[in-house]
Amino acid sequence: MQEWLEILLIHTLIDSSSLSPQRLRVMNRIISSQGSDLIKQKLSQHTSFFGIKLWILITASASIAFLLVLIISVLLCFIFHRRRCSQEPFRLRSKLCLPLSHIPLTNKQQIPYNRCGDDIESQRISQVGWSSARLSYYTRSFSSTGSFGSFNVFTFMEIKNVTDSFADDNVITKGDSSTVYRGILMGTVTVAVKRFLPSNSRYEDKDFITKAEMIANVRHKNVVRLLGYCIEGDERVLVYEYAEKGDLHEWLHGSAGRNRPLTWRKRMKIIQGVAKGLAYIHEDIEPKITHQDIRPSKILLDYQWNPKILDVGFIGHSDIPTLIPSPGNMDEKIDVYSFGNMIMELVSGRVSVDQSSPHVRVYLVDWIKEMVANHMIVDVLDPSLPEFPTIKELKRIVLISLRCVDPELKERPKMGDVIHMLQPHDLLLNNNAIQKAQKITRSHEVSAISIRQ
């Protein structure tokens, strides 16, 4: 320390103008060297804090301070984002509903929308405005595991842009009461847009909305999810999640099935998935819902061949979709019968009612029963199958289908029981069940003979 003071004293007393530049550079170098050595000496000294060196203590303190600032910043950003998600209205409808040609939307409406997908224990209904002609805004936010995070209300202009003004190229299927179109949301997300014919739009807005919102709460892997709706004037539109493989009817009786027939394993996967979906809506939710129109065209298939039941809670043959709570088990038994008939279509590859011959209708259920009664069960198999099941497996599946189409309602199993029956070693498929199926086929044979006489 004394050497350092002496150098400073010399430096201040001597007139720098009398020194040559070379001597000044030497003196500055000496001063810098002395100062550097002093700093190193101080930093290398042990402190009273557990004897840690000063430079280590300073470095550790700076690192801890930096981490604390970083953590606090991240927490503040997260809290701000959560508050913003739960409070701000959704103002990105133009980005959500991009048309296929990416034309910007006009006359956009701001609709409350939960983009975060957070769990909401108490569901809330946000009703912003009503008019005599139509419902202006109405949305219900709830927890979602899908891409959008809540139930959506679309304007008809948005629906038109999503489907390119309902272009014929986007038609997926046409029915007696509606047409289903392919649409694009957010420029990349494909959806199915179901537009009902104007003749099916005479019901009040509140009724349609209540039914749609109840169906939106149905969440199951084997049920097509309802993403939102549109209601303006006479227009009634439902927006569903999209299934990449199309409907089962196309794979059984259309061009897709002729080019690439479904394997036995895929058919069994479809049967099991539909059974689980029906058991869910029959037994696991309140109010219970029945479908009443189970058929291959109502079963959609995703890219992994998982079946998804379409139009859950809506009667397919009515003028407008109507929610049907099941007061008893009669409606459920109708679904069980339709499910058994669908199994027969999957096993045989035949349509439910064959009208290829003029003035003759051949019902698949009757044909299967006749083949079983005549011990020709092998002949019921779809000849286009890439590989055939074992006789034991075939008998098991046909037996299940026969139990489902039992003429006696009380003898038809519940869908929950059917799921157990589909397991390879289920106790429900015992000798008594086999005798019951044989009794059904024999009674059918007797009735058929009496009709001929």
Curated annotation (Swiss-Prot):
Domain spans labelled Protein kinase: 166-428
A GO cellular component entry from the record: plasma membrane
Spans through the membrane: 60-80
Active-site residues from the entry: 293 (proton acceptor)
Classification via InterPro entries: Kinase-like_dom_sf (IPR011009), Prot_kinase_dom (IPR000719), RLK_Ser/Thr-Kinase (IPR052232), Ser-Thr/Tyr_kinase_cat_dom (IPR001245)
Organism: Arabidopsis thaliana (Mouse-ear cress)
Record PANTHER family: OS01G0323000 PROTEIN (PTHR47984), PROTEIN KINASE DOMAIN-CONTAINING PROTEIN (PTHR47984:SF15)
EC number: 2.7.11.1
Residue sites binding ATP per the record: 172-180, 194
Record's keyword terms, sorted: ATP-binding, Cell membrane, Kinase, Membrane, Nucleotide-binding, Phosphoprotein, Serine/threonine-protein kinase, Transferase, Transmembrane, Transmembrane helix
Name this protein carries in UniProt: Putative receptor-like protein kinase At2g30940
Family statement drawn from the similarity comment of this UniProt entry: Belongs to the protein kinase superfamily.
Annotated compartments: Cell membrane
Bilayer topology term: Single-pass membrane protein
Superkingdom of this protein's organism: Eukaryota
Modified residues (Phosphoserine): 297
